[in-house]
Amino acid sequence: MKEYLINCTVQREFHLLAFSISADLQLVLFIGILVMYLLTVLGNLIITGLIYLTPQLHTPMYYFLCNLSVQDIIYVSSVLPKFLSILVTGDARITFPACITQMFFFAFCAVSEFTLLSSMAYDRYVAICIPLHYITIMNKSLCIILFSISWFVGFLNSLSYAVLVSTLSFCNSQDISNFYCDLKTMIALSSDDITYIKMLVYVESIFLGLTPFVLILVSYTCIIATVIKIRSSAGRVKAFSSCSSHLTVVILFYGTSLSSYMVPESQYSPEQDKFLSLLYTAVVPMLNPLVYTLRNKQVLRAMDNILKRYLKF
């Protein structure tokens, strides 16, 4: 009995159970994940650099985009390097402190991104519905406040999760049925009574996920109502095009992340959860820079100018 209690309290290692696939498929998956990781980091660094080097992009919209890029870099870097290491070495072990750290940074960026996307929707609302007051409303002070709220909410939420999980006991199993330390999986693994914890996390996920989503819906409802009143078709197209990139990112991010966290326990499938996790930890962050560059003439123009300026022979 004494040895059992020691194992419960001193256990400081877990095993990440990634995809059960053949060695050949593991190599293919490794190459795919590595390419997506490099594209995500490189793409977001390019966007951040473009915004910094181009005075014409020093506007609230692009400041928000710069914050989003930084969050995406931290987001993927908290999960994918360890996953790549598992695919190469086959060593799926992760220490308890490393697991808590990974979960902290992942939750930090995920929640911050939810909040930031709602701020970006408000920015688009002001730009389209109240254009004459845009500069007055979206001033530097408000932008800093919105950035700070985004990062603070994410930090506070992830810190509470990290503290919560660090107090749990893990006596039954040390096998995490995912390729990273996911909050939902970690809680389910605990040998403690987790009924109230699961309810707390579920309610908090709804609040932190759906509240920004409702704010985004309200913003876009007002935007659509305003755009419909524009008489010229060219004006309507221009207004909608200024929102298309943000709307695409919202659909991708919310569609994949909430579909994983809002699934009832009766319909839960570990393999399906891993697949959805792969989508919102690797695929969606890779698409974000592409969406904001390929669909944005200002960014493409800035990129062209930078290339001409620095690649002159």
Regions found by a protein language model. Give the residues of each.
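Transmembrane helical core of 7TM receptor-like proteins
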Residues: M1-F313
